[in-house]
């Protein structure tokens, strides 16, 4: 693919961009990081990568750059074709999609699959080996079910969903269009509901459902539990990393992102575009406002306002946490100073004449 063709494909995905070819129309065959790229590959640079010096060293044949005239001039000095956009990382993601097509099995049903006669399958569905589809399931068009997927009775999957190997979707779960569920995930299992009694624990049946809206992605070995009543809902375009746990009855907004090992207890309400970094824990029925951010390992026990950035355990405003952390690192020094000060005061007290 020539540089000029590549730009046409890229603009079709991201919209208009500014581009410049210094020396001809090079042949391109792939993408790579700027410090690893070889001849024939496209690479990118943004202000956050810290790799700006690689413009003079990279073997890449073309670059995706931020709107920075200095960087563009450095690329031109090496006769490298470049394009610029306000979001170079997004353009690079689109560039990957130009050259790389993920594995997609052909439509059809593997002979080892077990499909209940009452299940409804759409057009061009791919059903892999040993898949089990329960009674009254409804599968949309262009859905892919990889090997060993299990759909309990009454599950619905929207068009173009992809369910990876060894995932399980429990009864009556509703999965929207364009959702991706990665290997080992469990959607709609029973929530952790028990009532204490004199003799132990009384199990509360979990009669609710799980709803994933359009474009949700669930990482490997994650779990989203159904509630005793009502629903656990994940908003459109929300992305969950591997090993994320969503407790029963949680309400997650749209376009949220939760990194690995995030854990939400039951009944948590999360607004839109919230970011929870790795290993964040959220206590029962906590509310988190739109666009809030919690840094890694934060422990959230109370309400978080919209737009807030919190850190630490228990979670506090990030600026306060940074100041506290700076003091914490100096505690041994401060302790020694305080101990010396106490000793000096004690000596002064001993030397002071009694009245």
Swiss-Prot record:
GO terms for cellular component: carboxysome; membrane. Belongs to the transferase hexapeptide repeat family. LpxD subfamily. Transmembrane segments: none annotated. The keyword RNA-binding does not apply. Homotrimer. It catalyses: a UDP-3-O-[(3R)-3-hydroxyacyl]-alpha-D-glucosamine + a (3R)-hydroxyacyl-[ACP] = a UDP-2-N,3-O-bis[(3R)-3-hydroxyacyl]-alpha-D-glucosamine + holo-[ACP] + H(+). Catalyzes the N-acylation of UDP-3-O-acylglucosamine using 3-hydroxyacyl-ACP as the acyl donor. Is involved in the biosynthesis of lipid A, a phosphorylated glycolipid that anchors the lipopolysaccharide to the outer membrane of the cell. HAMAP family: LpxD (MF_00523). It is an enzyme of class 2 (transferase). Pathway: Bacterial outer membrane biogenesis; LPS lipid A biosynthesis. Its EC number is 2.3.1.191. GO terms for molecular function: N-acyltransferase activity; structural constituent of carboxysome shell. One of its GO terms (biological process) is lipid A biosynthetic process. Keywords: Acyltransferase, Lipid A biosynthesis, Lipid biosynthesis, Lipid metabolism, Repeat, Transferase. The active site is at residue 248. InterPro entries: Hexapep (IPR001451), LpxD (IPR007691), Trimer_LpxA-like_sf (IPR011004), UDP_GlcNAc_AcTrfase_non-rep (IPR020573). It comes from the Bacteria. This is UDP-3-O-acylglucosamine N-acyltransferase. It comes from Synechococcus elongatus (strain ATCC 33912 / PCC 7942 / FACHB-805) (Anacystis nidulans R2). The gene is lpxD.
């Amino acid at each position: 693919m020539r540089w000029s063709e590549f730009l046409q494909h890229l603009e079709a995905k991201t919209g208009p961009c500014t581009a410049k070819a210094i020396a001809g129309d090079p042949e391109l065959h792939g993408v790579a990081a700027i410090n690893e790229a070889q001849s024939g590959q496209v690479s990118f640079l943004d202000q956050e990568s810290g790799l700006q010096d690689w413009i003079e060293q990279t073997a890449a044949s073309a670059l995706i750059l931020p709107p920075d005239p200095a960087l563009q001039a450095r690329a031109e000095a090496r006769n490298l074709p470049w394009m610029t956009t306000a979001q170079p990382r997004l353009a690079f993601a689109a560039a990957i999609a130009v050259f790389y097509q993920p594995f997609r099995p052909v439509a059809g049903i593997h002979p080892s699959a077990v499909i209940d006669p009452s299940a409804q399958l759409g057009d061009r569905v791919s059903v892999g080996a040993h898949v089990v589809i329960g009674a009254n399931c409804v599968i949309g068009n262009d859905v892919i079910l990889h090997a060993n997927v299990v759909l309990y009775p009454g599950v619905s999957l929207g068009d173009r969903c992809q369910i990876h190997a060894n995932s399980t979707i429990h009864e009556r779960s509703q999965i929207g269009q364009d959702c991706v569920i990665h290997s080992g995930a469990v959607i709609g299992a029973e929530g952790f509901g028990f009532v204490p009694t004199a003799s132990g624990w009384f199990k509360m049946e979990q009669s609710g459902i799980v709803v994933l809206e359009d474009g949700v992605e669930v990482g490997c070995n994650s779990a989203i539990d159904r509630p005793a009543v009502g629903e656990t809902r994940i908003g459109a375009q929300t992305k969950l990393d591997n090993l994320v746990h969503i407790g029963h009855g949680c309400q997650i907004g749209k376009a949220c992102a939760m990194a690995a090992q995030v854990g939400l207890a039951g009944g948590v309400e999360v607004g839109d575009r919230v970011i929870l970094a790795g290993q964040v824990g959220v206590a029962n029925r906590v509310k988190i406002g739109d666009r809030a951010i919690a840094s890694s390992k934060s422990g959230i026990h109370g309400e978080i306002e919209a737009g807030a950035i919190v850190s630490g355990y228990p979670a506090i405003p990030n600026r306060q946490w940074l100041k506290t952390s700076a003091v914490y690192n100096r505690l041994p020094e401060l302790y020694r100073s305080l101990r010396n000060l106490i000793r000096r005061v004690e000596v002064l007290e001993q030397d002071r004449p009694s009245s």
